[in-house]
Swiss-Prot record:
Keywords: Capsid protein, Host nucleus, Virion
Protein name per UniProt: Triplex capsid protein 2
Family, as annotated: Belongs to the herpesviridae TRX2 protein family.
Keyword check for ATP-binding: no
InterPro entries for this protein: Herpes_capsid_2
Subcellular location: Virion; Host nucleus
Origin species: Gallid herpesvirus 2 (strain Chicken/Md5/ATCC VR-987) (GaHV-2)
Gene that encodes the chain: TRX2
Domain of life: Viruses
Length: 319
């Protein structure tokens, strides 16, 4: 249901849910669930842990991260008998006073933008088991944006290492990755259950990175002769190429010819098209590599630091 206070989704709970499990859900207010679709009413089985399975295979860190990008994040606002209410992020406004639960091991500070990542910290519990209905829920970890890229890079490097190792056993036991934040060290342990999925993800990523780097270099190579030629008559370009040193050195050795006219320059601009295509490709690659923060911590009269497990007021960060 879309209102002035945001898009609110009702998650229906089974009637067999026990009182103990209902109390567990009440403690999940402020946590995030990922919806496969946005409707007025959603079943609990649509957002439970088994909904992330791919062909009956338990998801690993990379597959969860990929699924998070394709689903709709929603913050649980109320857990009532028979249903839960959640506000969908990234669609319109959010209600005033929306609170996010800090599910990560880090303290969130006022002004921090928050990313949502799969559970990768061994000492942080991000699952709850509802025994009465045989259901398990998975919640993402809240991570400050300035740490998210480092964690993602280390997760991808672990996947590349696992793929390169193949079937050969590792010579020594692989130690857990460690990151530093505010003077403290934290251990991350990404899981790689399905190497086929990891290989597909990492292979696509690396091929696009290599292609983008190669295309960027080729565009630069085509522009270097023009840059040096213009440097013979333009003082500003002289400064750009190294205070006239490069231009003077090349001019003393060879006579740079005038650049030929661009092919079909009278009706199109090949250099512009190449640059436009390359910028678009790098932007798409950046969207794959980056984790977009949807929320920003904004405390007015409360504590500036939000401890793990506490609720913090947030505002939208997707505009």
């Amino acid at each position: 249901m879309s209102t002035s206070n945001g898009t609110i989704v009702e998650i229906e709970l089974p009637c067999k849910l026990s009182t103990c499990d209902a109390n567990l859900l009440q403690r999940c207010e402020g946590r995030v669930l990922f919806l496969p679709f946005v409707r007025a009413r959603v079943l609990l089985k649509d957002v439970d842990y088994k909904s992330f399975y791919i062909a009956g295979t338990e998801p690993d860190t990379l597959s969860l991260l990929s699924t998070f990008k394709t689903r709709f994040a929603a913050v649980i606002t109320r857990a009532l008998p028979g249903r839960m209410s959640a506000v969908v992020l990234g669609m319109g406004s959010i209600p005033n006073g929306l609170a996010l639960q800090n599910t990560g091991p880090f303290d969130l500070c006022n002004g921090d933008t928050v990313c949502l990542m799969p559970p990768i910290f061994p000492n942080v519990c991000c699952r709850i088991r509802l025994e009465s209905i045989d259901t398990e829920l998975l919640f993402p970890v809240t991570v400050p944006t300035r740490l998210a890229n480092e964690i993602l890079a280390k997760t991808l490097s672990r996947a590349i290492e696992a793929i390169g190792r193949g079937q050969m056993p590792p010579p020594t036991s692989r130690e857990s990755e460690t990151i530093m934040y505010n003077g403290r060290s934290y251990t991350i342990s990404p899981t790689l259950h399905s190497l086929d999925a990891a290989e597909s993800t990492v292979r696509t990523l690396l091929l696009n990175m290599i292609f983008a780097i190669n295309e960027g270099n080729m565009i630069l190579y085509t522009m270097i002769p023009t840059l040096l030629t213009l440097g013979a008559s333009d003082g500003y370009i002289n400064a750009l190429v190294g205070l006239e040193t490069a231009t003077r050195a090349v001019g003393q050795l060879i006579r740079i010819p005038n650049p030929p006219p661009l092919q079909d320059a009278w009706r199109r601009y090949p250099v512009y098209e190449a640059l436009s295509a390359w910028i678009t490709m790098t932007l798409n690659l950046g969207n794959v590599l980056s984790l977009h923060p949807l929320l920003k911590v904004c405390t007015f009269d409360g504590p500036a630091n939000i401890k793990a497990g506490d609720l913090c007021p947030v505002i939208a960060n997707w505009y």
